[in-house]
């Protein structure tokens, strides 16, 4: 790795990690917990920052194809610096798609499935996708930070959140590590034997 690149990426990672703790602190307060509640769960967690390259499209790319189909992220929250090209869309409550306007001054934040599970749906996972550009020659780089809790964290919906969401647990009792593995198997990035 180019030393200058590593220095810049390390600094960006630490700044985004610091921001994630502030956001998780706000979420914790909103939930009526102490400010460190969610942040402490991510200490020594599986948080990862990826650089994703969406190459230019081939001439045979079918009409209506997307770069990344509709999905929700597995983790607690995702922080996303503005990508090099448009394409990100989020699903509204009515099922319609809203284009996310990129702006280098802002960080986009998505809530993920693990936070939804833990809060029994008080925090909903953000359904999103990446659509193809109008120009097939356009490439796109994206750099999400997926903020994960430690594997041992129990994601069973907490009783206080169950009572706030109708009194019935809507999500499974599972640890973060098992949840991550289950989802990686579902998307073909792990096997059930791992």
Question: What positions do the PLM features span?
Answer:
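C-terminal flanking tails of non-heme Fe-dependent oxygenases
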Residues: 6-194
């Amino acid at each position: 790795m180019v030393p200058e690149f590593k220095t810049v990426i390390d600094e960006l990672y630490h700044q985004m990690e610091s921001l994630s703790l502030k956001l998780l602190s706000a979420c914790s307060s909103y939930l009526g917990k102490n400010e460190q509640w969610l942040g402490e769960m991510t200490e020594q967690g599986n948080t990862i920052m990826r650089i994703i390259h969406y190459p230019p499209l081939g001439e045979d790319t079918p009409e209506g194809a997307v770069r990344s189909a509709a999905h929700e992220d597995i983790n607690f929250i995702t922080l996303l610096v503005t990508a090099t090209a448009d394409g990100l869309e989020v699903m509204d409550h009515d099922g319609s798609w809203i284009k996310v306007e990129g702006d280098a001054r802002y960080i986009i934040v998505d809530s993920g499935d693990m936070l939804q599970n833990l809060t029994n749906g008080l925090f909903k996972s953000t359904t999103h996708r990446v659509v193809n550009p109008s120009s097939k020659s356009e490439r796109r780089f994206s750099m999400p930070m997926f903020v994960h809790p430690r594997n041992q964290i129990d994601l069973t919906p907490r009783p206080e959140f169950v009572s706030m969401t109708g009194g019935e647990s809507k999500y499974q009792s599972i640890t973060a590590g098992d949840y991550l593995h289950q989802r990686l198997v579902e998307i073909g990035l792990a096997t059930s034997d791992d």
